[in-house]
Regions:
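C-terminal accessory/binding modules appended to enzymatic or scaffolding proteins
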Residues: 305-353, 360-363
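Terminal connector regions
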Residues: 201-204, 244-306, 364-391
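Short acidic/proline- and small/hydrophobic-mixed sequence motifs that coincide with surface turns
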Residues: 208-214, 228-229, 329-336
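Conserved active-site loop/cleft motifs that coordinate metal ions or position small ligands
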Residues: 136-142, 336, 375-379
């Protein structure tokens, strides 16, 4: 299956907005596995693998012959992992059965993490491609999983009475992307219009009910050093949406390679929109969306060896939110926090250059700080590709 990375964009976008022919897209999605915390309690330890460490069952017309316990765990993500990580894991197309059958805590955690990353990247490309067209509505399938299994949800199963689950459903990586970037009113992204590796095509789009006046800043982050180079600053003045789209100036990519750099696109408010809705009345300079853009599939990235540590600090003074400090000794990509405590993080699944960053844990209901401290853990792409290939 194609990864659509770099994102393929039209050289000239079609006319957009309600005055032009448009469509509503319903529905699309991609399979993603839940976290180890969610999935593992439903399996015996010797079955902790995407293929359960068992011979494959034969399934057709909703009937399976064989004893493989994963045969009825809904939808597999083999094709996604092979497409996005097959080269890095040295898996042949259509192969890798031994890798999918590796059992144990760390192999299973790596398999589940890589599946969730692939789900997020596939949907990210699909949504960004959709917003480059005059598509004024998009329905993703689906919101939540119906039990701890491989499924289409952006949230895990949400019954807190079942072992490993959190109240309302633990957010998968894709759900954090939807909140931070993909379903933000204003988004900027970049891709190829047949011009890579020398140039990138970028757009900014406003689907909000109010006009947007702000800046779009696009930088290139070097993976080996974490150094950031500003490539473009654009004064964006967009009418009210939906479908207010502007093509940005063509971006030269001199000395920038998709395997060594990622792009960072940030949209900031320049001034508060007069008469704007409450959620649109942001302070001058406020960040409205942040987008980390790959110019190559993830298995082509030259990621440095990185160690990322998380430390639970203290409650924020105005409530039950808890500060967590993440520290990396080198650039880490797709840094993802997981915990057994009921709640979500203020941000998750992001690029972390060498240094530290603070995020908040926002509890669902009463805070269980002891459980948060004892169960929080962190993943990132280079680490999990290593544990997946060396286990």
């Amino acid at each position: 299956m194609p990864t659509n990375l770099p994102l393929l964009l039209p050289e000239q976008p079609p006319p957009t907005g309600t005055a032009h022919p448009n469509r509503f897209v319903s529905e699309m999605g991609a399979v993603g596995m839940p976290s180890f915390e969610s999935f593992a309690p439903s399996l015996h330890r010797e079955r902790w693998a995407l293929h359960a460490g068992q011979p494959a069952a034969t399934c057709a017309k909703k009937r399976c012959v064989g004893s493989n316990v994963m045969a009825r765990r809904n939808f597999p993500c083999d094709s996604l992992i092979l497409a996005y990580f097959g080269n890095a894991l040295r898996l042949a197309p259509g192969g890798g059965q031994g890798w999918f059958n590796r059992t144990g805590i760390e192999p299973f955690r790596a398999q589940l993490y890589l599946c969730s990353v692939a789900q997020a990247l596939w949907l990210k490309s699909a949504v960004e491609a959709s917003r480059a067209k005059n598509e004024l509505g998009l329905l993703l399938w689906s919101l939540n999983d119906q039990w701890p299994t491989g499924g289409w949800g952006t949230l895990e199963y949400g019954s807190s009475t079942v072992a490993g689950q959190v109240l309302g459903g633990r957010w998968k990586p894709i759900h954090y992307l939807l909140r931070r970037t993909l379903f933000a009113n204003v988004i900027a992204t970049c891709g190829s219009a047949g011009q890579l590796p020398r140039f990138a095509t970028c757009y900014v789009r406003n689907d909000g009910a109010a006009p947007f006046h702000g800046s779009v800043r696009i930088s290139a982050v070097e993976l080996s050093t974490g150094n950031s180079t500003r490539l473009l600053t654009f004064d964006a003045r967009l009418p009210a949406g939906p479908g207010a789209l502007r093509l940005l100036p063509t971006l030269p990519l001199d000395h920038i390679d998709g395997s060594t750099h990622v792009l960072l696109a940030r949209c900031n408010v320049a001034s508060t929109p007069a008469g704007g809705h409450r959620h649109e009345s942001l302070a001058s300079g406020s960040l409205v969306s942040r987008n980390e853009v790959l110019l190559a599939p993830p298995d082509e990235l030259l990621l440095p060896a990185a160690s990322v540590h998380v430390a639970v600090q203290s409650r924020r003074g105005d409530g039950d939110a808890v500060k967590l400090k993440l520290t990396a000794n080198a650039t880490a990509l797709f840094v993802h926090l997981t915990t057994l405590a009921n709640g979500r993080f203020s941000d998750n699944f992001f690029l972390l250059p060498a240094g530290s960053r603070t995020v908040l844990f926002l509890p669902f209901g009463p805070l269980d700080e002891k459980l948060l401290r004892s169960s929080v853990r962190v993943d990132h792409l280079q680490h999990r590709l290593g544990t997946a290939s060396n286990s």
